[in-house]
Amino acid sequence: MENAGALQLLSAAAAAVAVVVVVALRWLLARRAAGGWKQRPRLPPGSTGLPLIGETLRLISAYKTPDPEPFIDERVARHGGVFTTHVFGERTVFSADPAFNRLLLAAEGRAVDCSYPSSITTLLGARSLLLTRGAAHKRLHSLTLTRLGRPASPPLLAHIDRLVLDTMRHWEPAATVRLLDEAKKITFNLTVKQLVSIDPGPWTESLRREYVKLIDGFFSIPFPFASLLPFTTYGQALKSRKKVAGALREVIRKRMEERGEESGATEEAESKREKKDMVEELLQAEGGSFSEEEMVDFCLSLLVAGYETTSVLMTVAVKFLTETPAALAQLKEEHENMTNMKGENQPLEWSDYKSMTFTQCVINETLRVANIISGVFRRANTDIHFKGYTIPKGCKIFASFRAVHLNNDHYENARTFDPWRWQSNHKLQNEVGANLFTPFGGGPRLCPGYELARVVISVFLHHLVMRFSWEAAEEDRLVFFPTTRTLKGYPINLRQRS
């Protein structure tokens, strides 16, 4: 009897449980059908690595070598072109997919906003061109384009020509120079001139030395109390940032005082006054001038952009040409033919620059293989859906241009320097249109100084091949962290051409 009673109780309990399960399942299915029950977002696959550190150390180790590609290659092979990792203190979705990169660049200010590691944000300043958003960024971008986006201006082209020649005149007829250092002198002095109209001298050289320390801190890890420890890379960078900002602030205050003394000028006369540099553009901007701190951050960030990126490209282009004799020979022939047509010792003009067709192929290929801008950081403002995955709102995203540029599916022998691949008239247009070639970014944040950078590199290569022959003084190699550069600054032995 007891057994029979127990069996009945068990049967009743099982029936009750079954009813509860059925009711619960029906309720859950109904909620899901009505949209009231949301599935957890399906993130792109990947690994977040070690606690707190994530995969940051692996990424840094890879990018401090001449061949950083395995870091992304291995993850793309395992997870696909969009994968999840954890770097620089937070979970990050990496994209090596040109279609997703195109989406991110076009969605700036809507689905995504720019977002960089805290070390960069602190060192550049919140009001810098790289970090401002919305209407503020649009205004600064427009001003930068006005000042730096017109390299065809005869005075600007003449200044670039003169600055390159002045630098090379200090080279001995037979000497060893560290090319990256010399290229940085050119780009830094050019940018300072465009920003504050100060010619090369002790002030600019002192400023440049501090800039070197500032840039070294960009991708350092700002661990707690690092700012209080001056012996750390980040601590030194913060100290140099204060010095650079202070030097720029003095110049800006002096200009503001001078404008105050000239306040009697009519509004019409003021509008016709030539804006000699970027500070003048900022002080006379439509809609009112900028605050002192806005101008300091803005000028500081433009110095970083003009100083570092173009000088590295100049150096790497020479390295690639030295290692590719056929390309160097064709480049020399192009510039010798141009010089023979216009005559020696004649200043370069815009028509000369436009005739340097193979030079542009060399620049394109240098940008593709070893661009200093390997990609851009963004942060999702809303959930982003792509190929069945969901990148949730607030997630950090890195669009890797380098991964696309060096993908054999997009470029034949992608990791070989081959400037002839750009000789097709439609190659550049097609690659840019498909977002396979994005050395200057894209969308609303397309680099406003990209044409100026091309002009500076072209003028530099022209005078180098026409005045000197050279060879590598010692073996040097590329590394890619914190930015692309040659490990030793690429020293070369020069011989002046007769």
From Swiss-Prot:
Record keyword Metal-binding present: yes
InterPro entries on file: Cyt_P450, Cyt_P450_CS, Cyt_P450_E_grp-I, Cyt_P450_sf
Keyword terms: Heme, Iron, Membrane, Metal-binding, Monooxygenase, Oxidoreductase, Transmembrane, Transmembrane helix
EC class name: oxidoreductase
Any one of the GO CC terms: membrane
Name of one Pfam family that matches: p450
Entry's localization field: Membrane
E.C. numbers: 1.14.19.79
Residues reported to bind heme: 447
Keyword ATP-binding: no
Stated family: Belongs to the cytochrome P450 family.
Descriptive protein name: 3beta,22alpha-dihydroxysteroid 3-dehydrogenase
